[in-house]
Amino acid sequence: MAERHWSIWNMASLWVGMVVCVPSYMLAGGLIKQGMSWVEAVMTVMLGNVIVLVPMILNGHPGTKYGVPFPVLARASFGIHGAHIPSLVRAAIACGWFGIQTWVGGAAIYQLLNALPWITLGGADLPVLGINAAETACFLFFWALQVVVIYKGVESIRILETWAAPFLIIMGLALLAWAYVKAGGFGPMLATPSQFAPGGPKDGQFWSVFFPSLTGMVGFWATLSLNIPDFTRYAKSQKDQMIGQAIGLPTTMTLFAFIGVAVTSATTIIYGEPVWDPTVLLGKMGGGFSVVISLFALTIATLSTNIAANVVSPANAMINVAPRKVTFQIGGYITAGLGIVIFPWKLLEDPNGYIFTWLIGVSALLGPVGAILIVDYFVVRKTELDLDGLYRKKGPYFYRGGFNPAAVIAFCLSLVPTLPGFAHQAKLVGTVPPMFDTMYTYAWFVGFAVAGVMYAILMRVIPQPAVANEPVPAAATAEE
């Protein structure tokens, strides 16, 4: 059982630390580059985070009530061994985020070197990779730096975590101040009209961009909506976890999104085009001392947050699958390797790759898992779990060979409507029927609905082994 000492303030502060990162900034800036006005972009981010807050709070409930982390909670619905499925799904996505953050760190090093007056980097792009030799070297150097940290153990980076988020807040505010001065105030900064307005270059196309963007916003934090019990298990009460999350996630995300939106809008005035990547923007500012220091600190901050957020979880998931063969270091090396093979720079070339391929594709996997966890806990079990049974190999959650057929079937069926659309968006296939592209646009919502409904039906249709589904003693649960 976890010690329960986190208050509303602790839960809210947790979200401040997680929200303030470069991908969050790029998320909002990418909407400006897609043609939205600042109001449309900020409202899209806010709405997406309000939506994902719902499964976040719901999945946080069992963490607070029973003190169990995500991998243990998943045993109730997927089975003792079947719980490896959602854990590995979450781990695979963390590997992707590791690659994206590694590219951000490598790009910061590239811009840092270019900002030095005696160094000029560039050159033709390498075949297959699509980036030049210097960019490749900076990416691999930052990747190798993280591998060294993994080898030494995650504790070697703890001291940096304490100031990573504060620095990024300062950097964001500094960029906002710079944009304010350069663009001539908030009036000109935020005056850039929506390209979807009547007579604009994208007149009549707003909804075709808004809905997939909204799905991408939900997908951005859908990973945390699964393993949020890892944090809410420390909350003193349901009130603390609910209110803390409600304060911390949508408000911080909206405010940080505004910084990204305002600065990106200002770059349209300053440079004649929207610059949504802060590392590229810092590089465009020139080689001043403050820019060099900012790029260096951004590199260190990205290193610390990437190890903590995107190595620990997948490494632990791999250890759970094969505890005798996988150590934390081996799990970290596998994560680092997979982070390269996704070619993260391809995803970040433009908002289409980042939002429409990566974030929506991620949401197609995470929505179904979240739905199964929620339906199992609230609908099937009425919030009552056999706490001891979650830790017994032959207990009530062993199902059939350690797997719950209802959960596995529901998860697989939920991928059918969105998989063709993802294959088309990722350019794995040439064409698909238009209805699959449409369903992919709503991937998280479609997957959540299909998995939730199918799981509820299958749990009634498929005969379940006799289980002792008795509530745990009151002393084991947190204050309601």
Question: What residue ranges belong to the model's regions?
Answer:
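Transmembrane alpha-helical segments of multi-pass small-molecule transport proteins
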Residues: 87, 114-151, 166-175, 213-228, ...
